[in-house]
Design a protein with these regions (language model features):
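Active-site metal-binding motif and surrounding structural segment of the metallo-beta-lactamase
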Residues: 47-102, 193
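Cap/insert and terminal regions of metallo-dependent hydrolase folds
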Residues: 161, 169-270
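Core dinuclear metal-dependent hydrolase active-site scaffold
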Residues: 1-65, 128-183, 188, 271-275
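Short internal beta-strands
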Residues: 71, 99-108, 196, 238-240
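A short, active-site helix/loop in glycosyltransferases that binds the activated sugar's phosphate group
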Residues: 105-117
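Residue-level marker for beta-strand->alpha-helix junctions and adjacent short loops that shape enzyme
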Residues: 12, 80, 108, 202, ...
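Short, conserved loop/helix-junction motifs that constitute active-site signature segments
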Residues: 67-69, 91-97, 120, 186-191, ...
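Active-site regions of enzymes building and remodeling cell-envelope glycoconjugates
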Residues: 122-128, 134-138, 261-265
């Protein structure tokens, strides 16, 4: 169905600059808007057009797609940055008609508990549909499952299989859950040759004034230790979902250079990937 994916944002849920942040990372982005970044989302191109995640920047992100008619929405989970754009499908804005909403049963339940989003279903702006297809395969992963579950999504194409994994708690939990010893083994088992991978934090001491352990994500440093240097048969690994504090936002940083020197990549808004 789809033959191309566009990365519509590479930042964590709150984007960059982030509300309330007065550190250099966000002050730089306020002074120079070329440094601002939208939250992670994917544009799906083919005979029809879809979007993965509905961020607060959904209007700008659909513009980045070419302002194309959206026939379906996929959600990996329901943390605010991945779902808050749903309201834009309502009658105050787009007033869409029967756009398919594809998400897990627990996310369906979560949507229906919230009056603003429930109205979108009742008014026919959105219609729940199956959370899988012949070429799009959700894969459950551990990630703060108090209210709903979280999934990675595998997109299967003629040329590439692309795994989208913006959020998970730890490699230890995820690998235990999927029953593989290391990330590369898991990626290989999925026949995935492009990985859009959770790169939220560079290290475990990145957040100031907050307990970082309360926002669990594998750090990029840890992931690099696990996957090492890219070899000829390895998939492309592209780090996405970068927190506003992450030095990978700066291409001239030592951290960015370390990623690329090992043969891996950092996602950029507008990046196109063929399926």
């Amino acid at each position: 169905m789809y033959n191309k994916i566009i990365l519509l944002g590479n930042a964590q849920d709150a984007g960059r600059p982030q509300l309330g942040c007065t550190e250099k990372c966000c002050e730089d982005a306020r002074r120079d808007t070329t440094l601002s970044r939208m939250p992670v989302s994917l544009g799906l191109h083919g005979e029809q057009f879809g979007i993965v995640e509905t961020t607060r920047c959904i209007g700008d992100q659909i513009t980045l797609m070419g302002n194309l008619p959206i026939s379906e929405v996929w959600l990996t989970h329901a943390h605010l940055g991945h779902i808050e754009g749903l309201g834009q499908f309502g009658r105050e804005s787009f007033n869409s008609k029967n756009v398919k909403l594809r998400c897990s049963d627990s996310v369906v339940d979560y949507v229906m508990k919230h009056p603003i989003w429930k109205k979108l279903i009742e008014r026919g702006n959105l219609t729940f549909d199956k959370f899988k297809s012949d070429t799009i395969v959700p894969i459950e992963v551990p990630h703060r499952a108090q209210d709903f579950d979280t999934h990675a999504i595998l997109f299967k194409g003629k040329n590439n299989n692309i795994l989208f994994l913006p959020d998970h708690d730890t490699w230890e939990k995820t690998l235990d859950f999927v029953e593989y010893n290391n990330p590369k083994e898991w990626f290989s088992s999925l026949d995935a040759n492009i990985i859009l991978l959770d790169g939220t934090f560079w290290n475990s001491n990145e957040l100031k004034g907050r307990i970082q352990a309360n926002v669990p994500h594998p750090t990029v440093s840890e992931t690099l230790d696990l996957i090492g240097e890219k070899s000829v048969n390895d998939p492309r690994v592209i780090f996405i979902h970068l927190n506003h504090t992450n030095p990978l936002h700066y291409p001239n940083s030592d951290e960015y250079q370390k990623v690329t020197s090992l043969g891996w990549e950092v996602g950029e808004e507008g990046m196109e990937l063929n399926l």
